[in-house]
Amino acid sequence: LKKEIVKLTNEECEVAGIPALYHDVFTSGIHYVDFMFDIKHIRQEDLPYVGLLKAVLGYVDTEHYGYADLSNEIDLQTGGISNNILGTADVENIEEYSLKFEVRTKFLEDKTGAALRLVKEILCSSDLDDEKRLYEIIAQSKSRLQMAIGGMGHYMAGMRAMSYFSKTAKISDLT
């Protein structure tokens, strides 16, 4: 390990008129792309639905793929596509925070077009009206959460306690 800290540079640019950050670092030919959507305007009582959206995007049918075929295509064309909700506190004012919905993917250079088409397919044409499939996903999420609580109850209790004092912890608890 080197003792020096590697300095990262953020290069601000525009891609198709959209603000972007570029990091010129060696990645062995793997491209990492994060799409960030500002969701701070969403009311607090609606945040659990954003958490649900995070859970279902990529796991429901889209315009061109059934969910099983979509999963196979994601595996073939990318190193995965994931969704996250990021709440980060302002370092200068703890009462202020930013809230983003993140869609993250990684892929090899020759798969760029296919990977970005899949992200667009998921974001723009996911079928959120299939109640049976949504129920399956919610039931799976509930089961995973119940199993996690069994092994990490102390962590969950700590996160809930923090949610009473921290806006970002509250967002994490709600989503």
Language-model regions: role of each:
Residues 1-48:
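Proteolytic maturation boundary segments
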Residues 28-60, 64-125, 131-175:
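M16 family metallopeptidases and their MPP-like homologs
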